[in-house]
Structure formats: C-alpha cells, structure tokens
C-alpha cells in the first residue's frame, strides 16, 4: 500500500515535474487522476488554476479526467464557472470531450447553477451551448431559474427562459418560483414571471397558490398583481372563510379586483355574496348589486344548459 508521502510525491511530480518525467510515470502505469494534494486537487486541477496551460493540455491529451471533485465537492468546471474564468472554460472544452456538465456540488448545484449566482452570462451561454441541463435541480429541488429570480438576476433569468427553462418548475415542496418570491415581496420579479407564462393559480403540496401566500403574508401589492393576472380567490383547508375575509379587510385590497375574481371563482354563489357582505368587508353597493345580478344570470344560464 502506497504511503501518503509517496502519493503526494507523485502528485508533485505530475503537477510540477519535467514533462519527460511525467510521461515516464504514465508509461509505468501511474494513475494520472489518483494522486492529489491535501485539498483533493488532481494534477490537472492544480495546473489549470496555477496557469500552466501547456502542462494542462499535456495531461488532458493523456486522458486526465476533468470530472474529479476536490475535497469541497467542486470539479474543475464548477470552480472555473464560479471564478468566471471564460478563457480556461473554453480551453477545457477545446482540449477534451470528456466533461460532465451535471456533476453537482455538496449543495446539489450544477455548474449552470453556479454561473447564475453572479449572473455570469458568458459562462451560462457557453454551458447551454454545450448541452447543460437547463432544468437541473439542486438538493432543495430548485432549478437555476429559481435562484436567478430569488436573487433578482433578471438578465440571467431571461437567458434561461429564452433557452426553454420551465417557468413553473417546482421545488421539493412543490413551490414554484412565483410561490418563492412572496417572502421577498419582489414586485418586479413577479411581473417578469407573469409576463413569461408563470401559472398564477398553481398549487404547492399544501394546496397554497401564490395568491394564498400573498394574502396570508399581507403582501397587498403582490395580491393585487396576482388578481389582475387572473388569480382566483378560493376557500379550502388552507384558507377558511373567516381568515380570507379578515385578511382581505386588513389589507384594504382593491374591491373591484376581489369582485372580478369572485365571478370566476369556484366558491359557491352564496358564499361569494356573503364574502362581500359579512365580516365587515365593505364593498361598494354597486359591486354587491353587480355580483348579485351576475350570480342570478349564472343560475338562469345554467338552467338552460
């Protein structure tokens, strides 16, 4: 069994030794990827990041793998992306076809996730051109698009959407990106998502819609935006009648929007009218009359179907 000293000594020879000596070691059967330094870096890893590109090209020519993570779980490609080292990324792609684009960090982040953290657009474009999975998810089920929106990187988000990213992708809790931005109260991001096809009535694993979240969290501007975008008010296990009435009253939400949403809601007709009348929800009288007429007409039309 080889000692750690000998292993590290072989790493040093592979990473820093004369190339003729390296070639002799490889001919003798030394595994080019097995020998690492104390940080878990292979000779290829080390030479790329110390700038010895001729040696890196030599090692790649002799089948050194770019896919071996260091002690922090980061591959060469992942760290190049994090550092926005575009020239070295291109060098790697030009000198080997053996690059796994989907090896993830300990947090489950792919290189594409990493590229979005700092909105490294050129790195994103290069990865997507090489076939990176645009909807790949991390350990929490979040796609790269989740991260761009949550961190308000809308330029990166637009690039992902233009390449086919799923705007309604769900995480491990079945929350969509629209659900997740409620806590940030990011109106600009919400508008961006809705303009790009986000489903305003989609439910998570607790049957909450984005509107439910906005109402419960008392985010008036978001709630009104969702209502304007076709969100429907609903009552169920997650939002009973009293809670809904009190929350709407507390927010002083636009009555016209509530009125219009109730017309398309699957709440029963009696409850719709009661919602405008009870619990001190003071809708204008013409709204109540309009709703009553609408409900009456709905009953008449239903009778003739």
UniProtKB/Swiss-Prot annotation:
Q: Domain of life, per the record?
A: Bacteria
For this UniProt record, the keywords arranged alphabetically read as follows: ANK repeat, Repeat
ANK repeats span 5-34, 39-68, 72-101, 107-136, 140-169, 173-202, 206-235
Please give the PROSITE patterns that the UniProt record associates with this protein.
ANK_REP_REGION, ANK_REPEAT
Q: Where are the transmembrane segments?
A: none
Q: Which SMART domains match?
A: ANK
Span of the signal peptide: none
**Annotated PANTHER family:** CYCLIN-DEPENDENT KINASE INHIBITOR 2C-RELATED, POLY [ADP-RIBOSE] POLYMERASE TANKYRASE
The protein's name in its UniProt record: Putative ankyrin repeat protein RF_0580
